[in-house]
A protein has these predicted regions:
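Catalytic cores of the polymerase beta-like nucleotidyltransferase superfamily
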Residues: 1-369
Length: 369
């Protein structure tokens, strides 16, 4: 980090940390990505990196962003800039020497706080005041910020869930602007919508923001037929279990989220198996045997939330049982059968064994043949 900052400031340019790394440092939360803003232009950033023996990658050079690699760690370095034209998805930018121009084009006040390499805070838009009370607020006019990129509607709810103070509630101006610009969501790629909803569902307790999204018509816009009603019940049931956003998505419901949110093959499989298990309504031990422990837990939590009932007391014993048993019959045990008849017989015996809650032995099962 020191090497990168020294390289950028080598010829008198300004370089400041900005965004998530500053916000999370001040909140004493983990920092993952490091973003740096500078008054150097793209070609100067590349030149300064080369002069200091650092690798540079032109990841978003047309938008003024260069990735610098130092000690196998990446740093996103972006020029001070201002938006000249936006279409709700992309922006035409112009470089600037003024940090305030750069701050004004960001989304929320808490994301427009800068820091020097020595830790001096530069706060052109008084974002620190909002950060201290955990108030997630758009910069200046919320409508203008949203029209610049409609994904900011979903980001507003995600940031409120992740960083907002629940006692403060949701910023009223921001919420009204999100509801007023709801049609803009249709302009966004499904992948972007899916990625942002996934992040919302991964926050510790998204109940409040999902209920607000539901009331504002935003949830039904991205997931027709969905409802936030059962999410608080699920979150209460989750208790000490690891948060699984797919389970929360199952409880939200809605038409074909695997397509409307562009889920990966792995995510789609997990979603469909959990839903299939709910529709079959089998015991957790059977679901664990057929689909594995993760699906069994997801199924049990979803079912308890949707039916507003408690989890079975012996849930974990059932899941352990289902994942540890092995069907005792193999094809070689039915030597007199072949092809379709063999397949049918194996299925029939397996159903019988499952119905016995895995108690029938090989000998017992073969007696039925």
């Amino acid at each position: 980090t020191v090497l990168v900052m020294q390289a950028l400031q080598k010829k008198g340019n300004k370089a400041l940390f900005v965004g998530g790394c500053v916000r999370n440092s001040l909140l004493k939360m983990p920092v993952t990505d490091i973003d740096i803003a500078t008054d150097a232009k793209p070609h100067e950033i590349v030149s300064l990196a080369i002069d200091s023996g650092l690798k540079s990658i032109p990841t978003g050079i047309e938008h003024g962003t260069i990735t610098i690699v130092s000690n196998n760690k990446t740093y996103e370095v972006t020029c001070f800039r201002k938006d000249i034209k936006t279409d709700g998805r992309h922006a035409v930018i112009e470089y600037s020497d003024d940090i305030e121009d750069d701050a004004k084009r960001r989304d929320f006040t808490m994301n427009a706080i800068y820091s020097t390499s020595s830790g001096i805070i530069v706060d052109p838009l008084e974002g620190l005041k909002d950060l201290k009370i955990r108030h997630v607020r758009f910069i200046k006019d919320p409508n203008k910020r949203i029209v610049e990129d409609y994904l900011r509607i979903l980001r507003f709810f995600r940031f409120t869930s992740e960083y907002g103070d629940p006692n403060l509630g949701i910023d009223a101006d921001g919420l009204a602007a999100c509801a007023a610009n709801i049609d803009g969501i249709k302009l966004l790629a499904k992948e972007r919508i899916g990625a942002e909803l996934k992040k919302i569902l991964k926050t510790k307790n998204p109940s409040i923001v999902l209920a607000a999204m539901d009331r504002a018509g935003i949830l039904s816009n991205i997931l027709p037929g969905s409802s936030s009603k059962y999410v608080p019940i699920l979150i209460h049931q989750e208790n000490q279990n690891t948060i699984n956003w797919i389970t929360r998505l199952v409880v939200l419901g809605g038409a074909e989220p695997t397509k409307s949110l562009r889920l990966s093959n792995k995510e789609s499989r997990e979603y469909k198996y959990t839903l299939k298990a709910i529709n079959l309504g089998k015991k957790p031990s059977v679901v664990a045997f057929e689909f594995g422990k993760d699906i069994a837990l997801s199924y049990s939590l979803s079912l308890a939330a949707l039916t507003e009932t408690f989890l079975p007391d012996n849930l974990y014993d059932q899941i352990i049982l289902g994942t540890s048993v092995k069907f005792p019959i193999e094809a070689k045990d039915l030597k007199n059968l072949q092809g379709k008849k063999l397949g049918d017989a194996l299925r029939e015996l397996k159903d019988l064994w499952i119905k016995s809650e895995f108690t029938l032995s090989k000998k017992d099962l073969l007696k039925n043949r």
